[in-house]
């Protein structure tokens, strides 16, 4: 196969403020699978990952432990690299923002943007979120908190350098709305409406209130703010403005940046603006995925709901974990993680599906032919359908991989696995074996199964790189037979192929027993935070009701027409609400969470048949539905349903 063009794929560089968990794994495993698949196709692949090691949070964490920031990140980086080795991640380069060559690149980029007039000195006044290392304006806050992580923000005022964003607003809007740069493209609307339409504000790109960062060469009391520092890794790692590497012209622009949705804005808006200012080509695709959630929440050490991938991998093998997280998550959507979902997926797809197919087929070749098939063949019913399913598979998987739809690619491969298992039931080799005159037909059935397994396992080797070579060895597929170039062909294995019995690829798991042990090891309850524990205990104490009780509550979509504070009360707001038939007055104690003007015109959910009650002299005819978590409260808004719609 002729050499194809270079292919450059990147993960975000991870922030090493603590040890990695399974939530970190998805992006890296997904990128690794794409990189491996492209290598199979003959591409010259550069797969980059790394760590973002500067900032106030690192400085604070190091101080807490009594070590220097560099000593602190050195230890955490060992854990990240150890996890990637454990998960069989085939990255080509690991960049650290503390590397000398990266520092050189960042300083040169900052100076060039300053010389071009895109960076200027001013004074920053506003809000700062330390965990996200992000500046926000008052209008961008949600309930006074960081819109990304929902944590408290602090007042910040300091001399700073700013990057002019507005000159690039039109080009960025076209990039998001008129090209396939952003995947899934549905996210473009929220970015345009939330950040570009209101007017791109200049970006604070330096700090003076902490020292752990890259100094600005011409004003060393300033350090380069995290996003110019971190985002530049994608080009510094190729040798842009440094002499460490000489591969920028070869690999840039990147084919795929893959990131989680919480850093989408930086990669969809800030990074393109930086590249435009530098007169550099833009990346081809930004693939944005959701979060792996646990009990409905994003995995977070602060919530005590993280899952240790080392524990899972040691019990089930890294390939099973790789498969599970890729099979469960669709691009752009969140994916719920639970021990039960994971174990059932491993059992159904890997143990009962693929593993059973391989072991049954190999066992039958050994039982009926001593491990080596005869060369005589006899076609029969069901052969053509299996062969068509197998030979058409590669093109379908190629298409999904081109779209970074790994979940769909895996689902397509397992259609072949299911078809092959069905073929066994349809042809019943154990029945054919009873007729001595049908040896050729029996050999054909088993050969067809081996070929289907060869194609499936070859394509799956990008996703499960440890186990699939073992499967291919068991069915007697040599390295050449197991090549990508042969995945659209049938009849590649030698006619007299010899199989080799091996250990079970994916042993079946006792679900109940394993969940009990996992709960003990991972400490889903004992290791939970006080916040999660309190919530669990609260939920456990809630009395159950029947459907008849629930049916008595009339919940309707209503529209807020007016809203104003209630006199003599700091907590109450008075609403005029239209329920689809008439206006009604409602009083709600949410004044500490919303300004009246924020609620006018909104569609909310109202408990309509609540007995009227007087609050501060105002009769309230209903109750507005809100969600409460700790000290936080949010009204439940309904955007796309007509007023008067019943909630059921």
Tell me what each language-model feature is.
Residues 471-549:
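Intrinsic disorder at enzyme termini
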């Amino acid at each position: 196969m002729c050499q194809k063009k270079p292919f450059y794929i990147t993960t975000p560089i991870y922030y090493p403020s603590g040890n990695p968990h399974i939530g970190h794994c998805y992006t890296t495993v997904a990128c690794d699978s794409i990189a491996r698949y492209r290598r199979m196709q003959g591409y010259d692949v550069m797969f980059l990952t790394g760590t973002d090691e500067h900032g106030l949070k690192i400085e604070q964490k190091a101080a807490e432990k009594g070590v220097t920031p560099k000593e602190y990140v050195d230890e955490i980086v060992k854990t990240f690299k150890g996890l990637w080795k454990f998960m069989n991640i085939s990255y080509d380069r690991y960049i650290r923002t503390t590397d000398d060559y990266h520092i050189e690149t960042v300083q040169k980029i900052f100076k060039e943007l300053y010389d071009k007039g895109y960076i200027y000195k001013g004074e920053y006044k506003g809000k700062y979120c330390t965990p996200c290392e992000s500046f926000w304006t008052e209008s961008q806050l949600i309930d006074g908190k960081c819109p990304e992580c929902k944590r408290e923000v602090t007042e910040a005022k300091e001399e700073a350098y700013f990057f002019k964003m507005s000159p690039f607003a039109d080009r960025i809007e076209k990039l998001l709305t008129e090209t396939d740069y952003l995947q899934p493209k549905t996210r473009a609307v929220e970015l345009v409406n939330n950040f570009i339409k209101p007017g791109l504000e200049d970006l604070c790109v330096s700090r003076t209130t902490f020292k752990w960062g890259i100094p600005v060469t011409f004003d060393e009391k300033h350090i380069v703010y995290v996003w110019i520092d971190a985002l530049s890794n994608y080009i510094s790692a190729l040798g842009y403005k440094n002499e460490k590497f000489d591969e920028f012209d070869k690999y840039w622009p990147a084919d795929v940046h893959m990131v989680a949705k919480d850093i989408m804005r930086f990669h969809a808006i800030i990074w393109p603006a930086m590249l435009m200012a530098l007169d550099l080509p833009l990346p081809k695709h930004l693939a944005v995925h959701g979060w792996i959630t646990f009990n409905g929440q994003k995995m977070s050490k602060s919530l005590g709901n993280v899952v240790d991938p080392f524990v899972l991998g040691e019990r089930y093998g890294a390939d099973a974990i790789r498969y599970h997280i890729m099979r469960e998550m669709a691009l752009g959507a969140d994916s719920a993680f639970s021990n039960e979902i994971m174990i059932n997926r491993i059992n159904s797809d890997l143990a009962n599906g693929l593993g059973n197919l391989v072991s049954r087929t190999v066992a039958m070749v050994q039982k009926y032919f001593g491990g080596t098939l005869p060369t005589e063949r006899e076609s029969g019913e069901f052969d053509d359908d299996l062969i068509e399913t197998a030979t058409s598979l590669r093109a379908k998987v190629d298409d999904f991989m081109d779209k970074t739809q790994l979940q769909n690619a895996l689902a397509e491969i397992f259609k072949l696995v299911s078809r092959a298992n069905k073929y066994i039931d349809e042809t019943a080799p154990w029945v054919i074996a009873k007729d001595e005159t049908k040896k050729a037909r029996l050999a054909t059935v088993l050969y067809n199964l081996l070929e289907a397994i060869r194609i499936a396992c070859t394509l799956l080797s990008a996703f499960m790189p440890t186990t699939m070579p073992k499967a291919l060895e068991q069915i007697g597929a040599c390295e050449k037979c197991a090549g990508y170039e042969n995945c659209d062909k049938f009849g590649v294995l030698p006619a007299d192929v010899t199989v080799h019995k091996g250990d079970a690829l994916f042993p079946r798991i006792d679900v109940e027993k394993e969940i009990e042990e996992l709960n003990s090891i991972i400490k889903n309850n004992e290791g939970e935070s006080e916040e999660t524990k309190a919530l669990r205990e609260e939920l456990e104490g809630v009395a159950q009701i029947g459907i008849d009780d629930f049916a008595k509550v009339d919940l309707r979509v209503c529209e807020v027409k007016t809203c104003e504070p209630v006199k003599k009360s700091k907590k109450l707001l008075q609403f005029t609400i239209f329920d689809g038939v008439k206006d009604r007055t409602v009083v709600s104690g949410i004044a500490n969470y919303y300004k009246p003007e924020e609620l006018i015109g909104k569609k909310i959910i109202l408990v309509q048949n609540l007995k009227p009650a007087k609050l501060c002299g105002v009769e309230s005819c209903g109750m507005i539905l809100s969600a409460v978590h700790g000290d936080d409260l949010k009204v439940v808004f309904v955007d796309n349903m007509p007023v008067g719609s019943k909630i059921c």
